[in-house]
Amino acid sequence: MNWLPESFYARPALVVARELLGALLVVEEGGQRRVGRIVETEAYIGEHDLACHAAKGLTPRTEVMFGPAGVAYVYLIYGMHHCFNVVTDATGAGAAVLVRAVEPVEGLPPGTRTDGPGRLCKALGLTRAHNRRGLCTPVLHLRPGTPVPESAVSRGPRIGVDYAGTWAAEPFRLWVRDSQHVSKGPPPGRRKPA
């Protein structure tokens, strides 16, 4: 199979976040195949990153982040929206990349919104049942897509992490600049080109 190998994920979250842009996120369940091209990510680089769930240490919720790379970390926000992350870096690092938005490619009705982590999870059928699943399986995997040139990538602060002090301003959010599928973010004047 032409899946991204586990070794792809076993690198720093910022590297993986950049290289996931353009990759295909594939979910094949119940006889249905749903595919989205990743157009927006956020890197969470470990325990020292105060915006990262791992900053609070090893808990039942974050245990998956401290495990091997190449595993899904899916959690709920506001008790109703799922967020899909890929665990990155070395075992014990507590790092992950949040997939914030995808462009519909296959298996999604026209007009399906996939801008934002909750919407993309709903569209692709990703739930807590996918938490801790390996990303190199027929059910859930990522494939190489069309590479996104550096000139087409924007970087800026992550969304919704104002509580993280100076970490809130780090440009760890990456997106395909001209994509119509990225989530809402800072106004254009605050966005930093690559």
From Swiss-Prot:
It comes from the Bacteria. InterPro entries: Formyl_transferase-like_C_sf, MPG, MPG_sf. Signal peptide: none annotated. GO terms for molecular function: alkylbase DNA N-glycosylase activity; DNA binding. Belongs to the DNA glycosylase MPG family. Keywords: DNA damage, DNA repair, Hydrolase. The keyword Hydrolase applies. One of its GO terms (biological process) is base-excision repair. Its EC number is 3.2.2.-. This is Putative 3-methyladenine DNA glycosylase.
